[in-house]
């Protein structure tokens, strides 16, 4: 099996990834440890012209015209080694420059401070090789000709003058100085070996993907591409105290660590490929669980980055994320019941649910609250505008309820639908494991949560579910796709589901070019390119699709799915999100949870896709 694309400029290995620009390697990342910006920039009098551009399983090949000279450019990555080649039929007298710096989270970060905290240092090995060190990681860069190397306190700059006709630049990262130096020495002598190893690795992975029964070539191309994304986002981080098992990064080009709800979605997709990989995806999350029961929002590769971003001396922040993990556990165990995994998941989910009851339910009504917009997963959503404003108006009042709150506590409709599913799942696991008392307890708790959602969150006038403030149960009248999780969780009544379907297919609300914008299109704050303020995300499509199926709206589910699949198949693309008014892919490339479309395609296949 092969995948051939035109115009794709991103390529990744294990925790190493790179992105081509118009004139060389625009960005290179080694996890959350190092970045090259640029890594290899061709200096030319005029901007290079890209004449031909082909991406396949072996790497990326381009033909460039630079200062009247035609160059063949090739880049490949295998594991944590990258090779970059430039071939010229004649002397070109071109120069190339690059630099390596410690990784930062925001362009506003102080690189000098980060370098000091992570003990960054550079070292010249010889006239063609240098090494950098940061947070117990090494990264070596080597060329097949002499280069100028300038070691500074927080970066290493390098340049190659009068590049040879067969120019080779390689780099490799790892935990051993000797190993990375051996790797670059080997790769610079035989760079095409890296391309061969990469192609062999990817062909092996893709040979095991399930087949898709459809006559649509563009659908098959999307199917293969999304499998490429979910399988190559898998990562192994050596010598990490929490990331002890392989896991999927959401994307290796932006979000290079593990997130809670992302990994739950990844596990759901991986269960279609290999149930053991799906279980493995959740192990680090279980391992990261804190003594009080909280499963953290995210697990950083770099403690320095987490400390600077969250002001905690840890690899994890103090927040959680939407509890989709029980949904993933149920999907895995429905595929294959593993008693050992079921017992582990049961114990972890019970502790996690107890944490929600103790730490996110101050009014003890069996509805939990978000107290930080980032732990909602909907970062800058219109949903949180008023709650953030309320906290600013009454900080003392809200901080008495929750000292770390960054918005007025919100009993969110999606959070509590997921908690309902989690409590039902715990009840089912307890019964399967013979703990009937706990099973009855969590069944009753789930029922209380369901009743309160129906009592407080449904609005008769607008026929829609809304978030409510925890202290007053006043509705926050912002329509979002979170309401459709009441159908996913089977909480909505038949009559309510009918009304929700009307909202879904209203072009003024959620039936936009790319369906399900993160706020209804009739909201004054709707922005079709706004991150969580109007873009469309595939996880919301997935929840809504299965909600429609749950209530027997099979034609409507198919209509939703096909509209989304058609747009994604145009590339194919598997982007972080999409402009809801045009369908244009936006956000990060090769985004993990957007492969949830595979789960939908697999279900649609039963009816002839």
Q: What do the predicted segments below correspond to?
A:
Residues 183-197, 218-225, 274-287, 338-357, ...:
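Extended, well-ordered alpha-helical scaffold segments
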Residues 216-257, 286-315, 365-411, 451-535, ...:
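Extended glycan-interaction surfaces of carbohydrate-active proteins
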